[in-house]
Amino acid sequence: MKYLFSLFLLSFFYVVTVAQPLAGNETHVASTPDTYAIVIGISDYKDPDIPKLSFSNRDAEVFADFLMSAPGGNVPKQHIKLLIDSVATIGEVDKAIRWVMNNCKEDDKVYFYFSGHGEMENVTMSKNGYLICYNTPSVAFVNMGLSIDYLNDIVNTISVQTKAKVIVITDACHSGTMTGSKFKGNFFVGEQLMLKKKNEIRMASCK
């Protein structure tokens, strides 16, 4: 299933990338926009209580390679923050987010790709969702996970305030291990990830 999702992504972005110059040549001549990407893939977590995933790290590497290829837009390697397994701590993820916000400008394109575990808390009525980083503990993921509310705020700030195009791609597996319940977990995580504004593209596979 994960391979099918990855294949769909590569096919989709190949079409989008190839078609863009044709759509833009008619009316708009401007400086070439830059592309930045945060690509995260975590298969092996620090906390042994968090189940391992088989292909998340490899999927992230494949996506980063695609972005650097001609069909993916020839994105310079220095414009891609690739965070795999133990490198993908909450601190490094936040650092990468700030790096993008400090560098992107109007009409740029920003990719945020995450493949790994997603989870939601079941204490509040909001059922807030989180993306689980490498060093996020299973017993305190609310404090050391990447809040989807925070991620949505970042994405909206870049798309609305900076006026850059943002593409959010998440392949987040919800196991229910950290909350003790699988009930509607993938629905809530996926629903929160799909709250988008103008100038944003979002794709989520939540299982």
Predicted regions and their residues:
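Caspase-like (clan CD) cysteine peptidase catalytic core
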Residues: 19, 23, 27, 34, ...
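Active-site-proximal C-terminal subdomain of hydrolase catalytic domains
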Residues: 41, 84, 166-207
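Glycine- and acidic-residue-enriched helix-capping/strand-helix junction motifs
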Residues: 46-61, 65
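Bacterial N-terminal signal peptides
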Residues: 6-16
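Signal peptide-proximal N-terminal region
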Residues: 62-78
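Short beta->alpha junction loops
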Residues: 80-89
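Positively charged n-region of N-terminal signal peptides that target proteins for export
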Residues: 1-4
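Short, solvent-exposed loop/turn elements at domain surfaces
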Residues: 45-52, 76, 140-141
